[in-house]
Design a protein with these regions (language model features):
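Extracellular adhesion/glycan-binding regions together with long Ser/Thr-
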Residues: 26-66, 150, 155-169
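Small side chains
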Residues: 34, 87-89, 223
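Short beta-strand element of the conserved SAM-dependent methyltransferase core
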Residues: 23-24, 64, 128, 292
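Negatively charged
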Residues: 94-456
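C-terminal, structured domain-capping segment
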Residues: 2-9, 47-94, 182, 186
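Glycine-centered loop/turn motifs
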Residues: 1, 42, 50, 76-78, ...
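Short loop/turn segments at connectors of secondary-structure elements within structured domains
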Residues: 13-17, 77, 178
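Surface-exposed interaction patch
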Residues: 1-34
Length: 456
């Protein structure tokens, strides 16, 4: 391989000086040396010809001295210069273009962005550029590459003079690669409304935890170029994006994700979520609060969900106040232990298919249907309460309920059952397991017609 040095920035005061260079391999052996003088900006120096022949990744060290040598260099102040090293041929120099990890996980909008001086609440736009050349009008720039080799640069401008910055992130070859841990990467961006991340390479990311968390002004996120095949953690990924109205995740491959807790939690204006065939959930173990407080969501297609490894569905649809229909017939719940508040405050929910639910391992169903005041029929004929210890407020204020099938459950034997049927319609028809359960229901639902409690 041939190795070259491009003099991208060389002030006049340095142009007459003699520069000495030495190139060492990973064994600290000098493989090339020389000098140059009387050079101008844009000139190219050949550092080595056919000296680097290894096909493996190796570390080389280049020393450059001005009018001196390795043992006796001189120093000059206030003279800025920039060299660019590049190679041609087999074994050419490879730069990863990977963004460095945050040294501190962001905790609020006053946290800094990607280890720079910029605060997250000072940003109004973020653009992925196809170059790492910092423009002259940049107010600030920093090398944010993981290897600190200049392959990924961040800079900002303030073109409208509003003290909010336009952030640019660019790499040498036009592709910016995210690090494996993207936790909080674009979180707490109070003043950013649109994010086009089509130029961000996410193919090596394993964590997208809280990636866009509490970016309250976001109305659009372009994730069409995201490669999520290696991602394991999506905890709170879009949580708190309160102005987000739609999300197209049809390109997401989530076949390795284990944590989907709170992915869309508190996205109060989210009306549409598009999930493609590769949005797999077969490895997911927690869906706690996954859609909680998505209060504008009317429908969501979960027909491809495989929940066979999920252990908690606590508050999964909590306060989805506009949700009208839920078909969960594909859900496998044989490992679920917690259904606390799963559908609580789904006040518009009229139809729900739970006919394939296996609740044999569920210990708490407390407030499961609390304030589902629009639902008229609940077929829970597959529900058992063998492991249940808490059904408090389970059907509290299901005031429109006309038919309830609980023929395989033994609610009377559950120790914590306070207000389980509080404010339930007294005209409801209830299908129960035996006479013991019938008596329990008659004594529990105020003013219920005894003939409406049917055994078998």
């Amino acid at each position: 391989m041939n190795l070259y040095l491009s003099l991208d920035l060389l002030p006049t005061a340095l142009q007459e000086n003699t520069f000495v260079y030495e190139l060492y391999n990973g064994n600290n052996e000098r493989i090339s040396s020389g000098n140059f003088s009387d050079k101008r900006e844009g000139d190219i120096i050949t550092l080595a010809e056919n000296e680097i022949v290894t096909s493996n990744v190796s570390i080389y060290t280049l020393y450059i001295y001005i009018d001196g040598n390795r043992d006796n260099p001189i120093s000059m102040t206030n003279q800025n210069f920039r060299f660019n090293i590049y190679g041609e041929g087999t074994g050419a120099i490879y730069k990863e273009n990977v963004i460095q990890n945050e040294t501190t996980t962001p905790s609020n909008s006053s946290s800094t962005f990607l280890n720079t001086e910029v605060l997250r609440n000072q940003i109004e736009s973020i653009t992925i550029e196809k170059t790492n050349v910092v423009p002259n009008d940049a107010k600030y720039s920093k090398d944010i590459s993981s290897k600190q080799d200049g392959s990924v640069m961040l800079w900002y401008t303030d073109k409208d003079n509003n003290s909010l910055y336009e952030i640019s992130i660019g790499s040498e070859n036009g592709s910016v690669e995210a690090n494996t841990n993207g936790s909080g990467m674009f979180a707490y961006l109070d003043n950013v409304s649109t994010l086009d991340l089509s130029g961000l390479d996410t193919s090596n990311m394993t964590s997208m935890s809280k990636m866009f968390y509490n970016s309250k002004s976001l109305t659009n996120i372009d994730t069409s170029g995201f490669d999520t095949t290696k991602v394991v953690n999506m905890f709170g990924m879009f949580s708190g994006c309160t102005n987000l109205k739609s999300l197209d995740l049809s390109n997401f491959d989530t076949s390795n994700v284990t944590n989907m807790e709170g992915v869309f939690q508190n996205d109060t204006n989210l009306k549409e979520i598009k999930l493609g065939d590769n949005f797999k959930t077969n490895k997911v173990t927690t869906m706690l609060a996954m859609f909680a407080s998505c209060s504008s969501l009317k429908r969501v297609d979960l027909s491809n969900f495989d929940t066979s490894n999920v252990t908690t569905m606590q508050s999964m649809f909590y306060k989805c106040e506009n949700l009208e229909l839920l078909d969960l017939s594909s859900f496998k719940t044989n490992k679920v232990t917690n259904m606390y508040c799963m559908f609580a405050y789904c006040t518009s929910l009229k139809t729900i298919n739970l006919t394939f639910f296996d609740t044999s391992k569920v210990t708490t169903m407390q407030s499961m249907f609390l304030f589902c005041k629009s639902i008229e029929m609940l077929d829970l004929s597959t529900f058992t309460t063998d492991g249940a210890t808490n059904i408090m407020y389970m059907f509290d204020t299901c005031s429109s309920l006309k038919s309830l099938d609980i023929r395989n459950a033994s609610f009377s034997s559950v120790s914590k059952n306070t207000s389980a049927f509080n404010v339930v319609n007294s005209n409801v028809v209830v299908y129960v397991k035996n006479d013991t359960e019938k008596e329990f229901i008659i004594n529990t639902i105020k003013n219920i017609i005894s003939d409406n409690v049917i055994v078998g």
